[in-house]
From Swiss-Prot:
InterPro entries: P-loop_NTPase, PanK, PRK/URK. Keywords: ATP-binding, Coenzyme A biosynthesis, Cytoplasm, Kinase, Nucleotide-binding, Transferase. One of its GO terms (cellular component) is cytoplasm. GO terms for molecular function: ATP binding; pantothenate kinase activity. It is found in: Cytoplasm. GO terms for biological process: coenzyme A biosynthetic process. Belongs to the prokaryotic pantothenate kinase family. The gene is coaA. This is Pantothenate kinase. ATP binds at G99, S100, V101, S102, V103, G104, K105, S106. SUPFAM superfamilies: P-loop containing nucleoside triphosphate hydrolases (SSF52540). It comes from Mannheimia succiniciproducens (strain KCTC 0769BP / MBEL55E). Pathway: Cofactor biosynthesis; coenzyme A biosynthesis; CoA from (R)-pantothenate: step 1/5.
Length: 317
């Protein structure tokens, strides 16, 4: 069997359909882009560049696909309500966005929120990050888990699952804790309210995890209707993390209230060494042990290249 034949056989038995950037862009069809450069700027992450061309090429087709899934989901809910004789409101559609530190999950989530909010159906779209469900800094220190921050063990998973269950059940004004990247901690007594949205986007490192399922055990992924994994080679992720760390050293870290204010005093060489060490001992380790193994569970994978642009899209069949 030649290489070309092996490739076609591999694709045939893959659970994913693979699209080049050009092929995926064609699936936008005639959907108009209402987002402007001015609208895009506040959606971007720190030290991240993303063009309107990227939005129209990658995210518009994705928003179009998700809307088809939502419409089908609504039809199923109508059938279920008719069967049960219910007049309940529609159940919120939950989208999860997973991936490594520094891959650009937050930007992807905000862009998707903006596009879906402006779709003709005028749906209400809320966005919550799982950072708010990290254990407080004091607890992590007390239990010697600070070096595991971002790992599954550092999250109050039962609290996150209760939040998702309440949202799915249609409860009004469900509270989600707020995390501060400045203080590196949960903000006491401050919450985001999620009030029966049509769509909830949940963004975080480990939202696709299932672990070793025990009887009647519930996972975050059990509440998710459509999952996206933002992917890139680890070498790129590490490079982007170090670059972002250097930018923070000149900006956020200089704030006297910053948990990392001491890093602002580092020379560039010391900062690079520190960031690389953090990656090697924490973020990279978490990626390999906990995040990357969940990639194949996603409904859709966005694979980025060196310029942060998505080069390949994989859609579960």
């Amino acid at each position: 069997m030649n290489i070309e034949s092996q490739s076609s056989v591999s694709e045939k038995f893959s659970p994913f359909l693979t699209f080049t950037r050009k092929q995926w862009a064609e699936l936008r069809k005639s959907v108009p882009l209402k987002l402007t450069e001015q609208d895009l700027k506040p959606l971007l992450g720190f030290n991240e560049e993303l063009s309107l061309e990227e939005v129209s090429t990658i995210y518009l087709p994705l928003a179009r696909l998700i809307n088809y899934y939502i419409e089908e989901n609504l039809r199923r809910q109508t059938v279920m309500n008719r069967f049960l004789g219910n007049t309940n409101a529609n159940v919120p559609y939950i989208i999860s966005i997973a991936g490594s530190v520094s891959v650009g999950k937050s930007t992807s989530a905000r862009i998707l929120q903006s596009l879906l909010s402006n779709w003709p159906e005028n749906r209400k779209v809320d966005l919550i990050t799982t950072d708010g469900f990290l254990y407080p800094l004091e607890k992590l220190k007390k239990e010697n888990l600070l070096h595991k921050k971002g790992f599954p063990v550092s999250y109050d998973t039962p609290k996150l699952i209760k939040f998702l269950a309440d949202v799915k059940s249609g409860k009004p004004n469900v509270s989600a804790p707020i995390y501060s990247h400045l203080t590196y901690d949960i903000i006491p007594d401050k919450f985001n309210k999620v009030d029966r949205p049509d769509i909830l986007i949940l963004e975080g490192l480990n939202v696709l995890q299932t672990g070793s399922r025990k009887a009647e055990q519930t996972f975050v992924s059990d509440f998710v209707d459509f999952s996206v994994y933002v992917d890139a080679d680890e070498a790129l992720l590490k490079e982007w993390y170090i670059r972002r760390f250097l930018k923070f050293r000149e900006s956020a870290f200089t704030d006297p209230n910053s948990y990392f204010k001491d890093y602002a005093k580092l020379s560039k060489e010391e900062a690079v060494e520190t960031a690389a060490n953090i990656w090697n001992t924490i973020n990279g380790l978490n990626l390999r042990q906990n995040i990357l193994p969940t990639r194949e569970r996603a409904n859709l994978i966005l694979r980025k290249g060196a310029d942060h642009a998505v080069q390949e899209v994989k859609l579960r069949k």
